[in-house]
Amino acid sequence: MCIRDRLLTWVNKGYEVITLTASCGLMLKFEWPLLLPNDEEIKKLSKHTKDIDEYIVDIHQKECIASGIQEIDSGVTVHHACHARAQNMGNKARDMLKLIPNIKIDLVERCAGHGGTFGVMKKTHYIAKKVGKLTVTKIAKKNNKYMASDCPLAGKHLQQLEQDTKITNNEAIHPIEILAKAYKLI
């Protein structure tokens, strides 16, 4: 059974497919249907796929999220990754984090330079570092403890650049982890 059919088994039972990374969401929602434009099953899967931040925001708008959310210990710089911006859904990571009481959120909408394997390949790593350097500088100026990116690879790449350049020591995590901190789950 192929991945499409496995995911559709759940979609046909009434579930949504929730992606944890912006690149996976972009692939399932937009790129796969472009690659196979005549496949109705792929179109169906695409319509029932959501980014995890988008999913939480939708739940809150429809039903309100669970009580018990508390302030966190510091501000957050949200890196709005390229693959999230390409989905044209707005900045759902920021919208989700706004659910946390009294949170300070700063936004950086700039390429991290990672680009999937581009950022780790020996031949292109130096370019990835060069592209990401300005983004890291912008993040450092925000002076927040946390840097949350809806693309974990971009977040880790930016964190590595921070360590290489000795700019700052942000903790790079996924926005859903910030929400988990606000619920005292981690």
Predicted regions and their residues:
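Iron-sulfur cluster-binding electron-transfer modules in prokaryotic oxidoreductases
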Residues: 1-186
